[in-house]
């Protein structure tokens, strides 16, 4: 199962959180969902060269929308004196007709963020770089940056071949079945003269284990419950 499903969706609620942090009743849910999709599409298109890793949305009861933009190049998003982020905020307010707050979050290690790695490979393929070279260079950079494992797959008319095929490489360990494993997944498309190429990237960053404090609380609760059961038995 871990080989087939989206690794992020499989781990949401276990070790990963939702990108949309809001609650809505049945009447408003569909409108908010469509609005979220429009916001993500608009921001991704406008700031594509800024290396957007992910976009998180939060909604408050007073018709306010907070957008967290995770980017590898925060300077390009903010602009000189904050002009860029202010312009983006005004455009989003005009589109949504709501009060919008834009928060820019810097991505410290873009080499181990799968979405940015996939987009970087796609950009290289559009510049006619050999697909094998582009994939292997991206894998080497990720492993040097501290990734525990990486898997890359490219599909389409590779090298201009008449028949489409899929080719992939992996390095290190990528345990897709382990739910506590922090697997980052990204997908991008490259528009070449021979047609579209699809790039998928899986990056293993290590295991996310429960904190020591939580373990102690759980152990204390278990001990209290067992003592209570003993008293009842007496």
Swiss-Prot record:
Source species, domain of life: Bacteria
Residue ranges the record marks as coiled coil? none
**Could you describe the subunit structure of this protein?**
Part of the 30S ribosomal subunit. Forms a tight complex with proteins S10 and S14.
- KH type-2 domain: from which residue to which, for each copy? 39-108
Q: What does this protein do?
A: Binds the lower part of the 30S subunit head. Binds mRNA in the 70S ribosome, positioning it for translation.
Q: Name one GO biological process term.
A: translation
Q: Which UniProt keywords apply?
A: Ribonucleoprotein, Ribosomal protein, RNA-binding, rRNA-binding
- List GO terms (cellular component aspect): cytosolic small ribosomal subunit
Q: What is this protein called?
A: Small ribosomal subunit protein uS3
Task: Mention any Pfam family matching this sequence.
Answer: KH_2
What is the protein's species of origin?
Answer: Alkaliphilus metalliredigens (strain QYMF)
Gene3D superfamilies tied to this protein: 3.30.300.20, Ribosomal protein S3, C-terminal domain
Family label: Belongs to the universal ribosomal protein uS3 family.
Looking up PANTHER family in the UniProt record yields:
30S/40S RIBOSOMAL PROTEIN S3, SMALL RIBOSOMAL SUBUNIT PROTEIN US3C
The molecular function terms of the Gene Ontology recorded here are:
mRNA binding; rRNA binding; structural constituent of ribosome
